[in-house]
Amino acid sequence: MLNHPASARWGKHFQFRQAQKMNTPDKRYNDYSSYLKEVFPDFKVQKISINAGFTCPNRDGKISHGGCTFCNNQTFNPEYCQPTNSIRQQRDEGVLFFKKYEGQKYLAYFQAYSNTYAPNEILQARYEEALAHPNVVGIVIGTRPDCINEPLLDYLGNLAKERYVMVEYGVESTLDRTLLNINRGHSFDVSRKAICQTAEKGINTCAHLILGLPQESREEILDHADKISQLPLTSIKLHQLQLIRGTQMAKEYDEHPERFQFYTADEYIDLAIDFIERINPSFVIERFVSQSPQEFRILPNWGLKNYEFTAKLEKRLQERETRQGRLFEKR
């Protein structure tokens, strides 16, 4: 277990809990920035990406060689975040890259590929290498729900008593039909079980969903909100379907464009609002959109920065006089 002099000082902040219902007339959903301020009231916190050099069972042949049809990991690796660099080097360069405020702290974000897909002793060594910096206060681990095991969850549960820990699962859809079509390699039930097991260990848990996957109707998309809202999540991350160059999905679009629905920015804003109306009001919403670099992205092309999109969405929430969880039903 990590032994760091700051652990005792910071540990009290990081105990797992679902966020309280924080949305107000001015902020009609539980935004990530407010959540971080609640968890870390004494300093600003920034994520720094880490590429630990892991792969994915959907690429190395354990499940498949093709990977998910939408996936190109190059689209979210910062320049400093290269697997040829050590964890320490990536961490230190990320700290320098994002340093803006006196006393700023950081979360090491293991983002590329499946960051629980290795022997546990290797995983623990790499997590702890990232944490071995006086200004790194926690880790966020992106992974697949079929790449988790009980001993690792025990380790992370103990670590979460000392540092902030979030496990972010790529759920993508709650429809097994869709998961099969995008070559995800697991069912929604696997996601559900992994989320429940992780939360039971006292670990903050996030679900990542793509809105608008091929051949999903609007009502099926909104049903994702109903299903995911019954799970013990801390947060969710949403983004629009993006068609990325070099992916199997791009090839599918060329051959069967009728399977796809790409929304305009205004259409997606209304879809996202319909979605969060049905989302558990205790969940934090980390984001609504993601923008892959233009050189990779085929569609959609909205010409909006993420903050511009969010401002438009917040304005639309006010116009519709609605908020997160307005139509939520606990089952």
What are the functions of these language-model segments?
Residues H4, H13-I87, D92-L107:
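N-terminal [4Fe-4S]-dependent radical SAM core
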Residues Q15-K37, P41-Q46, S235, L243-R331:
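Auxiliary Fe-S-binding modules of radical SAM enzymes
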Residues Q46-I50, Y106-A108, I139-I141, V165-Y169, ...:
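Hydrophobic faces of well-ordered beta-strands that scaffold small-molecule active sites
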Residues Q74-R91, F98-N120, N135-I148, Y164-V190, ...:
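Core AdoMet radical
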Residues F98-K99, Y127-P134, L156-Y164, C196-E200:
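Acidic (Asp/Glu)-rich catalytic clusters
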Residues N120-E128, N149-N158, I182, I221:
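Distinct, well-ordered alpha-helical segments
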Residues D189-M249, D266-V289:
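Conserved C-terminal portion of the radical SAM core fold
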